């Protein structure tokens, strides 16, 4: 059984900053290399400023060409009535859901993009 690059990246994405730093140190020791340039360039700023985000906001940026399909997708995702969903879509950019987990946010984004919407996760 072989691990794909995508599986490795997914595993690293789920790690905390501390765990990533420990992984980098272990890789430096095992392979006899140094990641000093990469750490200095981006790691210092990222480590101090960015903590692992656990809650995300799903923002409808625009409805695109197929507004009816987007309204249906918004209704299904939010449980809003037809009038409320249409008002939300017409008022884009607008927050669809706030404080959701990453997996739910990604699934909602995929569903809405398949309907033709432009969606952002913040």
From Swiss-Prot:
The keyword Ribonucleoprotein applies. The keyword Ribonucleoprotein applies. Keywords: Ribonucleoprotein, Ribosomal protein. One of its GO terms (cellular component) is cytosolic large ribosomal subunit. Pfam families: Ribosomal_L12, Ribosomal_L12_N. InterPro entries: Ribosomal_bL12, Ribosomal_bL12_C, Ribosomal_bL12_C/ClpS-like, Ribosomal_bL12_oligo, Ribosomal_bL12_oligo_N_sf. SUPFAM superfamilies: ClpS-like (SSF54736), Ribosomal protein L7/12, oligomerisation (N-terminal) domain (SSF48300). One of its GO terms (molecular function) is structural constituent of ribosome. GO terms for biological process: translation. Transmembrane segments: none annotated. Forms part of the ribosomal stalk which helps the ribosome interact with GTP-bound translation factors. Is thus essential for accurate translation. HAMAP family: Ribosomal_bL12 (MF_00368). Homodimer. Part of the ribosomal stalk of the 50S ribosomal subunit. Forms a multimeric L10(L12)X complex, where L10 forms an elongated spine to which 2 to 4 L12 dimers bind in a sequential fashion. Binds GTP-bound translation factors. PANTHER family: 39S RIBOSOMAL PROTEIN L12 (PTHR45987), LARGE RIBOSOMAL SUBUNIT PROTEIN BL12M (PTHR45987:SF4). NCBIfam families: L12. Belongs to the bacterial ribosomal protein bL12 family. This is Large ribosomal subunit protein bL12. It comes from Vibrio vulnificus (strain YJ016).
């Amino acid at each position: 059984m072989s691990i794909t690059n995508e599986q490795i990246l997914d595993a690293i994405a789920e790690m905390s900053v501390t765990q990533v730093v420990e992984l980098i140190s272990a890789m430096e020791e095992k392979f006899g290399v140094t990641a000093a340039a990469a750490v200095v360039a981006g790691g210092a700023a990222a480590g101090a400023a960015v903590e692992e985000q656990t809650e995300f906001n799903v923002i409808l940026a625009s409805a695109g060409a197929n507004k009816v399909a987007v309204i249906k997708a918004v209704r299904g995702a939010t449980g809003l009535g037809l009038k409320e969903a249409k008002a939300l879509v017409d008022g884009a950019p607008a927050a669809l859901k706030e404080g959701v987990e990453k997996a739910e946010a990604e699934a909602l984004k995929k569903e809405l993009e398949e309907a033709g919407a432009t969606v952002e996760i913040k």
